[in-house]
Every structure is written in structure tokens, then in C-alpha cells.
Amino acid sequence: MLKELAENQFSFLGFYERRVKRILPALYFVITACIFSGWFLLDPFELKELSQSIFATSIFSSNVYFYLKHGYFDVSSELKPLLHTWSLGVEEQFYLIFPISLFLLLKLGRGFAVAIYVILFLFSLLLASSLVEENSAFAFYMLPTRAWEL
């Protein structure tokens, strides 16, 4: 992306199209498998939970859903087949914000953009470190505390 921006060849449409082609086929396969197996294996309450997590996963917000509803290491986590998609939610939220912010910040200068991202990186790392004890679920699931890893 940086190379494309430097060469004035970056396309938001192309960037997001590549993400869609890379992520959606496998995601749709997993969701379809969960629907099919859930129909036969889960009781009505668990099926309702599955449908909610499918919706959240479909709009790339499963990290928020699982943060609000469950803990990653709950006893019943084996009954949440889409629990692992929390990281996909974080990644896609990052992909929504990063290209646009990078494009805008580079208009103010490369040094300025680098400085802002260093500050945001450090803020994210410090926030994650400080919340591990107080709110470990937020520190685990949410973009502000995971952005430094991306």
C-alpha cells in the first residue's frame, strides 16, 4: 500500500477488493459449515447464540459481540464455533481505518504521518498493558488495544 501510494497508484477500491477476495470465500465456507452443523448439533438456545455470532461475524464485529457476550476462555467456548473470528473483526476494522487515515495523513507530510502512527502505536500498547488487569476482555478483544500488533 505504501508503495502504491508513493507511486500514486493506490486505489481504495482495489485495496478493499483484494481483501474481499482473500477473506470472504473462506469465511463464507466456515459460516456455511457452522450453519449446517449447528442445525443438527445445537439446541435452540445455542442455535440462537450461533445465529447472533454469525451476524456479528458477517459484519466484521465479532470481537465486539464476543467482548459483550462472552469470555474467550469460558467453560463453554468449545460451543462457540465462530469465537476465533474475533481477530478477523479486529483486522477488518483496522483495514477500514488505516488506509483512509494513512492517505489523509500523508497529505500532511510523511514525517507527520510517521509521528502520528508512532504515537498511536505507543498509545495502543500502553492501553493494552494497562487494561490487562482491569478489563482483560477489552484488552483481549478490541481494536484500540490490538492496533499495535497490526
Locations of the language-model features?
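Membrane-interface helix/loop caps of multi-pass membrane proteins
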Residues: M1-L150
